[in-house]
């Protein structure tokens, strides 16, 4: 049972699309500051502030 759980967990982790997030060097303190940056750079308003840097999602 434990092996099947670990196998399922490994499959889920491997199937996550890591390339969907785009990192930027733009400093931020709130996610709302990233929305215009993401629109300008990647054409999408979906973004958030992580570790004081904007991260945009496609």
UniProtKB/Swiss-Prot annotation:
Gene Ontology molecular function terms on file: ion channel inhibitor activity; potassium channel regulator activity; toxin activity
A cellular component term, taken from the record's GO annotations: extracellular region
InterPro entries per the UniProt record, alphabetical: Scorpion_toxin-like_sf (IPR036574), Scorpion_toxinS_K_inh (IPR001947)
Domain free text: Has the structural arrangement of an alpha-helix connected to a beta-sheet by disulfide bonds (CSalpha/beta).
SUPFAM superfamilies: Scorpion toxin-like (SSF57095)
General function of this protein: Potent blocker of both large-conductance calcium-activated potassium channels (KCa1.1/KCNMA1) and voltage-gated potassium channels (Kv1.3/KCNA3 and ERG1/Kv11.1/KCNH2).
Protein name (database record): Potassium channel toxin alpha-KTx BmKcug1a
Modified residues (Pyrrolidone carboxylic acid): 22
Family matches, as Pfam families: Toxin_2
Disulfide bonds: 28-49, 34-54, 38-56
Tissue: Expressed by the venom gland.
Site, as annotated: Basic residue of the functional dyad: 48
Main location: secreted
Family: Belongs to the short scorpion toxin superfamily. Potassium channel inhibitor family. Alpha-KTx 01 subfamily.
Organism: Olivierus martensii
Subcellular location: Secreted
């Amino acid at each position: 049972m434990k092996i099947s759980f670990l196998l399922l967990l490994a499959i889920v982790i491997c199937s996550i699309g890591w390339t969907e997030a785009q990192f930027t060097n733009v400093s931020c303190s709130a996610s709302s500051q990233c929305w215009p940056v993401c629109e300008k750079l990647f054409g999408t308003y979906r973004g958030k502030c992580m570790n004081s840097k904007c991260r945009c999602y496609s």
